[in-house]
Amino acid sequence: MELYNGERPSVFRLLGKYMRKGLYSILTQGPIPTHIAFILDGNGRFAKKHKLPEGGGHKAGFLALLNVLTYCYELGVKYATIYAFSIDNFRRKPHEVQYVMNLMLEKIEGMIMEESIINAYDICVRFVGNLKLLDEPLKTAADKIMRATAKNSKFVLLLAVCYTSTDEIVHAVEESSKDKLKSDEICNDGNGDCVIKIEEMEPYSEIKLVELERNTYINPYPDVLIRTSGETRLSNYLLWQTTNCILYSPHALWPEIGLRHVVWAVINCQRHYSYLEKHKEYLK
């Protein structure tokens, strides 16, 4: 017998929302992380564990992602970065790669359809990584949602696609070198062409740290990095940015992640806040 005549889920959702508000009011008595990064590990193992059809783990993982992003938004976290697809993932079986690409395209197109809702919540969506490696439909869709949400600022969702940290560092060095070269160029007023006056160039022009960091894909640096499945490897993710970052590795597979894991990550960050702030000053 249906006691609530189909309304029970909405009642429980409402109750859960108020309970979260109470929990957040306690957590916000301490510092809240500005930026939380995630490695979504365990979708495949979750599918095997529950005998799901191919792709079932990724679909369950997407639902978990929506919940986690909701918690971050409600808690007042400003930035969330998701390791959505590594360049190294291209080494997987072609049909697996294509499935993930199709799923990403489907979800991005879904975001485009819900553009008004995303803008109402003031959410900015940014794709970061070597986006030239994406196929044209996916690249076009990503560009469309980025342009549509570019002016939003309350919550910034960074999706690392076709990303590895080593590729990012190479990109940052290349762009910094180009910037350095441009600073040595002097425009000829006669025809507008730029020439380099060798005699006026410095014999050694180093790239400064601030210049390199300006050309990385992902800023600001994360305060907490959560990797599910109990793994502590960074897997070529944010190697440059995690010098001063808490690593939290719950044993839950990614589709099993919940509010308690996000809360515990925030508490860990608060416990080590003083040390992390001192370390930041030391690194300056």
From Swiss-Prot:
One Pfam assignment: Prenyltransf
Catalysis: reaction(s): (cis-prenyl)(n)-diphosphate + isopentenyl diphosphate = (cis-prenyl)(n+1)-diphosphate + diphosphate
Keyword field: Transferase
The keyword Transferase is annotated on this UniProt entry: yes
Residues annotated as catalytic: D41
Keyword Transferase: yes
Biological process (GO), any one: polyprenol biosynthetic process
UniProt cross-references to CDD domains, sorted A to Z: Cis_IPPS
GO cellular component: endoplasmic reticulum
Tissue spec. comment: Predominantly expressed in latex.
EC number annotated for this UniProt entry: 2.5.1.20
Family annotation (InterPro entries): UPP_synth-like (IPR001441), UPP_synth-like_CS (IPR018520), UPP_synth-like_sf (IPR036424)
Family: Belongs to the UPP synthase family.
Known role: Proposed to be involved in rubber biosynthesis as a particle-bound rubber transferase responsible for the cis-1,4-polymerization of isoprene subunits. Probably requires additional factors for the production of high molecular mass rubber.
Name this protein carries in UniProt: Rubber cis-polyprenyltransferase HRT2
Species name: Hevea brasiliensis
